[in-house]
Amino acid sequence: RNFYEPSVRVPMLAYCPELIPAGRTVEEMVQNIDVAPTIMAACGLAKAPQMCGESFLPLLKGGTAADWRKRIYYEYYWEYAFPQTPTVFGVRTDRYKYIRYHGIWDTNEFFDLQEDPYETVNLIDHPELQDTIRSLANDLYDWLETTGGMQIPLKRSVYYRHGDHRNAKTY
């Protein structure tokens, strides 16, 4: 429920000696949406048209990544069951990460991952980085508009355990 590196950089092991050289490490930005297309490609199947991810099998085989993604996006929407976690949008490149919070938090974050891989220094207010921050923020919002991410997905939900807060007079 956050866009920090320990939640994003999840290790993955792949074993297929017929296709993948032993000891191969992929440094490119791969996402969970890429796993199914990769398995399908390894099985000789075409990716389904509605799938958003891409096969990273060429990367596993040691191929070049000239046309591989240069950034990843993140979106997490507030949930009733986790009220302390805000809606979060983010974009990450090889070097920078911009995180946009919505709600009462509203303290956005910007990190230089080359200089600060543990994300301990928020650079959001640094004057010399404002052009980069604006560029990533615009890119993030362009992506959200293209993918429908600006429409907050609300589920029909009734939580009887807590009742109707208007009528319960407690929160």
Where in this protein do the model-derived segments appear?
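Intrinsically disordered, low-complexity polar regions and short flexible loop motifs
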Residues: 116
